[in-house]
């Protein structure tokens, strides 16, 4: 199974990187690398994430990397990463089409 990052998830990664890079560009690169690597781990264990509490019964799951929630859905063609956001923020339901 492969990991497919949606356009929205990629936009969120860029926003995170741009924000962190304002104070520490090297840390921003490391953070994005960790998030992407964590998402890549879903290829071996797609069900390792928990069900997103804000969206019960939808099949939307999440894994955590540091302070960030990586939200995804398991599809026949692969794991679809829907969005990434800082855990203290309100859940972006528009990002997942719910």
Question: Which role fits each region the language model picked out?
Answer:
Residues 2-60, 94:
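Basic, Lys/Arg-enriched alpha-helical interface segments
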Residues 65-68, 73-98:
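Enriched for short, Lys/Arg-rich terminal
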């Amino acid at each position: 199974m492969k990991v497919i990052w949606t356009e929205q998830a990629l936009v969120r990664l860029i926003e995170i990187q741009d924000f962190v890079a304002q104070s520490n560009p090297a840390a921003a690169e490391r953070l994005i690398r960790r998030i992407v690597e964590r998402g890549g781990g879903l290829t071996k264990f797609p069900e390792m994430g928990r069900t997103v509490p804000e969206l019960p019964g939808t099949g939307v799951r999440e894994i955590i990397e540091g302070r960030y929630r990586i939200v995804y859905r398991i599809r026949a063609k692969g794991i679809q990463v829907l969005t990434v956001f800082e855990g203290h923020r309100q859940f972006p339901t528009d990002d997942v089409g719910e």
